[in-house]
Amino acid sequence: MLRVNSKSSIKTFVRHLSHKELKFGVEGRAALLKGVNTLADAVSVTLGPKGRNVLIEQQFGAPKITKDGVTVAKAITLEDKFEDLGAKLLQEVASKTNESAGDGTTSATVLGRSIFTESVKNVAAGCNPMDLRRGSQAAVEAVIEFLQKNKKEITTSEEIAQVATISANGDKHIGDLLANAMEKVGKEGVITVKEGKTLEDELEVTEGMKFDRGFISPYFITNTKTGKVEFENPLILLSEKKISSIQDILPSLELSNQTRRPLLIIAEDVDGEALAACILNKLRGQVQVCAVKAPGFGDNRKNTLGDIAILSGGTVFTEELDIKPENATIEQLGSAGAVTITKEDTVLLNGEGSKDNLEARCEQIRSVIADVHTTEYEKEKLQERLAKLSGGVAVIKVGGASEVEVGEKKDRYEDALNATRAAVEEGILPGGGTALIKATKILDEVKEKAVNFDQKLGVDTIRAAITKPAKRIIENAGEEGAVIVGKIYDEPEFNKGYDSQKGEFTDMIAAGIIDPFKVVKNGLVDASGVASLLATTECAIVDAPQPKGSPAAPPAPGMGGMPGMF
């Protein structure tokens, strides 16, 4: 029999769970600031060409060695709950910048720390935090507008390689390989980075449309040496439904025989007498035919079949449109220059669909990607479809002597890939923090327009913050940051900055030291947004720590195997 729980034990349990700790005003902000500084110190050592690596203990396997800011930020958890709260908010800055731009997380962390530090000082001195925030937001908008006017569009393969090299911490091999991949698959092509199985990095490019479904039966193989089906100029029958009846494929087989062209059937499935007829025709040598299952599931399958139809100039046979494969005509069948099918995947090359229809389909997919309601997963799938239609797919297989080396190099490849995409999308600026230093000159106008003293301090907060990334890059190279930042500021030419690798002043864009505009913009917006909100915090609430020696949580009375059963 189960004993009834006492009310007092339930009260104790609830009270235990609801115990919180609070800190107000200056005390709360000081604790948050300490956490922000701890995280920023760890992340900022990786900044610039002479930045250092960070070694991170992993729960499983070998330790991870990395120079990727967001990886370092995510690895940090602090013991003091209030400090950890500050660190978590700065992690949010790095994560947001990583999601939106894919790079620039270390710079965003340095900016966030600087804005928050200055704001905390000003609030402690009696400034209105809301006015400080208004001033800093106005300054950020002015800086972005200035950078927008001075950015340079990226056009050549050399410039793409330069962007990738900078983001890969000066590794020219990574830059060249990514530029090569982008040249082959186009700006919208999919480039994926995977861990390879050799010592060298490899680039594998698939042009045309590739999907992960192979032949239904090995009887269709035309090249026994390679185990592949290879067709030249085939007809393509596309069906949304399963094909079982011989009547469904008879017209298509006859058309294939008459035109002396191979036939590729892509359907939900092909079985029964339809599959038997296909195999029999193939074995007798009457018709070259192959059946493949359509890729994906549900709506994704429907969309992919639609894409293949647009690419090949065919029609998808579907019950919705009341067109059946048993009535197929030559106009309804698609065609392609060549098709290669293995047991795992199918590649269609040189589809003969209309270029206008193809461009319209790509535009439709782009508009869905741009829609705010589209989820990240859907965007990823749409981006893949767009790549297959417009360019191709490139896979970079990262090689190395050990798991740790491959993991570190893969991080740099992904950073470089994101930075390159951002540069191609929105243009480039002189790198090494140079563009932000030049932007400080326009903040005098913004300061004059500020309606009160506190807003002017907000503008000054941004003015001080945007010099910090360059200062940190220079200091990581062992130079005197403040002196060199002053010299960059005095230099009238927008592109003139300091090359920390060589220790000389130079035209940054000509030297290939560049930052994507999107990365700089998103880093500044994310950092100022979170940091100025942090400064307006008046109360911080955390779960109170457990007293030493007490159990983590009292067991709920009357649970199976616990006291209360008899």
Swiss-Prot record:
The Gene Ontology biological process annotation of the record reads: cellular response to heat; mitochondrial unfolded protein response; mitochondrion organization; protein folding; protein import into mitochondrial intermembrane space; protein refolding
Question: GO molecular-function annotation terms?
Answer: ATP binding; ATP-dependent protein folding chaperone; protein-folding chaperone binding
Which UniProt keyword terms apply here? ATP-binding, Chaperone, Mitochondrion, Nucleotide-binding, Stress response, Transit peptide
Q: Which PROSITE patterns match?
A: CHAPERONINS_CPN60
Q: What is its main location?
A: mitochondrion
Which Pfam family is an annotated match for this chain, by its short name?
A: Cpn60_TCP1
InterPro entries found in the cross-reference section: Chaperonin_Cpn60_CS (IPR018370), Cpn60/GroEL (IPR001844), Cpn60/GroEL/TCP-1 (IPR002423), GroEL-like_apical_dom_sf (IPR027409), GROEL-like_equatorial_sf (IPR027413), TCP-1-like_intermed_sf (IPR027410)
Q: Does the keyword Transit peptide apply?
A: yes
Q: Which residues form a coiled coil?
A: none
- CDD domains given in the database record: GroEL (cd03344)
Q: Which intervals of the chain are annotated as region Disordered? A: 546-566
Instruction: Give its localization.
Output: Mitochondrion
UniProt keyword Nucleotide-binding, yes or no: yes
Q: Which SUPFAM superfamilies match?
A: GroEL apical domain-like (SSF52029), GroEL equatorial domain-like (SSF48592), GroEL-intermediate domain like (SSF54849)
CC per GO annotation: mitochondrial inner membrane; mitochondrial intermembrane space; mitochondrial matrix; post-mRNA release spliceosomal complex
Per its UniProt record, what PANTHER family does this chain match? 60 KDA HEAT SHOCK PROTEIN, MITOCHONDRIAL
Q: Tell me which family the UniProt entry assigns to this protein.
A: Belongs to the chaperonin (HSP60) family.
Q: Cross-referenced NCBIfam families, in alphabetical order? A: GroEL (TIGR02348), PRK00013.1 (NF000592), PRK12849.1 (NF009487), PRK12850.1 (NF009488), PRK12851.1 (NF009489)
- Provide the function of this protein: May participate in assembly and/or disassembly of proteins imported into the mitochondrion. HSP60 are ATPases and have affinity for unfolded proteins.
| Record's protein name | Heat shock protein 60, mitochondrial
Give the organism the record lists.
Answer: Candida albicans (strain SC5314 / ATCC MYA-2876)
